[in-house]
Amino acid sequence: MTIIYYFANQKNYLVCGTGNKSEILIGYFTKHGDGACDMEPIGDLYKTEVYRLSEFLNIQEEIIKKPPRAGLWENQTDEDEIGMSYNLLDQILYLYTERDMENTKIAEKLEISADDVDMIIEKIARSEHKSKVPEFPKKTTL
């Protein structure tokens, strides 16, 4: 990222990220790695919406159908690492973050275990620090 920012700075450019809403909400990115950017053009689109946008834009089907993967190790896929499909993840995220639905109600509605919903909600909570300005000490007066 340092090199990318070096060249962006030389030309007064911004660094564009590739994160989508699904990845951002659960913290599926490296804080100062792939998450380091000045803007996220698809940051308010769930992964399933990114797929629909790709189809609308006539992106090659071979690209759309390729399983998302960070490429961290051989045969690694995002969905295996997350623990569920993006389709299910996005439904949970939508109901929890945009409809303020309770865990048990989400599980009922989607006919899944409450443990799966809890796992995602925990990912959201554990990664909250990734989307915030770092903490710093406050000045005090004597």
Stretch-by-stretch model annotation:
Residues 2-142:
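ATP/NTP-dependent adenylation/nucleotidyl-transfer catalytic domains that generate, transfer
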